[in-house]
């Protein structure tokens, strides 16, 4: 089975890391701790649906100088190794006693001087993807090093898209556009709404989506009360207003 090609060339990720490091320097930050799918994907290209399992934490440490360090469960070593990172540290997970805590702390100690600061996103639309008890253990193990908010560092860098990213986003939006154009093929009077949802997901996949994270929508006479409920088997009727929203992903980019 041939290996999948990297989503971007190495130079794209190197540029992202360089911009993060420049922003970190401006905030007197010695390293950056990333733990969420989007942030880790951004600096490594590590793309997997295995994130849907909550059983394992994953980390990437971005030092103020040099390349990022992946601190990940051993199950992800091969996939991460296909990317551009060279320093990949693993543990056998899940481990109820030490699920990456000591390995992460050791990595931080190597890259952050005593009294230094490691940033991690803490603001709106962020979270730390590890048990709070383990986060507290890491904090204690790396003291007197401080963990500070890196929301602005990460978000200001990520929100400025490269031409390569724009092309990926455009491609994913094109998939959604083509799928929406096919809605009249299956959204017909008498067709159950839950089947319309399934047909829409099928259309997204047929048009090139790698997967469909969700489909949101609703239908009702003159409007609808909410768009987050699961679809029912109620048939579409004359006078219904139908709304569909996509959750399509292609090469890690979403529409």
Language model: regions and residue ranges:
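Flexible, acidic/His-enriched mid-domain "rim/lid" segments that flank
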Residues: 2, 17, 95-212
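N-terminal accessory/capping or targeting/presequence segment of soluble
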Residues: 2-106, 174-178, 232
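Divalent metal-coordination and catalytic microenvironments
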Residues: 24, 169, 239
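Receiver (REC) domain switch-region micro-motif
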Residues: 32, 118, 242
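Acidic, glycine-rich active-site loops and adjacent beta-strand->loop/helix elements
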Residues: 37, 94-95, 122-125, 220-223
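Short catalytic-site patches enriched in acidic/histidine residues
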Residues: 40-52, 151-156, 160, 191-255
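A general structural motif
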Residues: 57, 67, 113-117, 144, ...
């Amino acid at each position: 089975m041939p290996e999948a090609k990297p989503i971007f060339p190495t130079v794209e990720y190197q540029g992202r890391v360089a911009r993060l490091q420049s922003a970190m320097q401006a905030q007197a930050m010695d390293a950056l701790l990333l733990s969420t799918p989007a942030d880790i994907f951004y600096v490594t290209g590590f793309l997997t649906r295995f994130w849907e399992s909550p059983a394992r934490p994953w980390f990437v440490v971005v030092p103020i100088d040099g390349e990022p360090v992946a601190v990940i469960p051993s199950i992800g070593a091969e996939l991460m190794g296909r990317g551009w990172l060279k320093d990949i540290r693993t543990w056998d997970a899940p481990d109820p006693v030490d699920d990456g805590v000591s390995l992460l702390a050791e990595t931080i100690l190597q890259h952050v001087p005593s009294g230094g600061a490691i940033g991690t996103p803490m603001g709106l639309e962020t979270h730390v993807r590890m048990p709070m008890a383990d986060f507290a253990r890491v904090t204690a193990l790396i003291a007197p090093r401080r963990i500070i908010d890196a929301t602005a560092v990460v978000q200001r860098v990520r929100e400025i898209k490269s031409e390569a990213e724009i092309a990926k986003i455009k491609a994913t939006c094109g998939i959604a556009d083509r799928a929406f154009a096919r809605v009249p093929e299956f959204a017909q009077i008498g067709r159950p709404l839950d089947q319309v949802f399934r047909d829409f997901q099928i259309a997204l996949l047929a048009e090139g989506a790698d997967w469909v994270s969700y489909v949101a929508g609703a239908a009702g006479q003159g409007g609808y009360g909410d768009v987050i409920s699961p679809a029912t088997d109620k048939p579409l009727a004359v006078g219904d207003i139908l709304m569909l929203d996509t959750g399509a992903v292609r090469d890690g980019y979403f529409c």
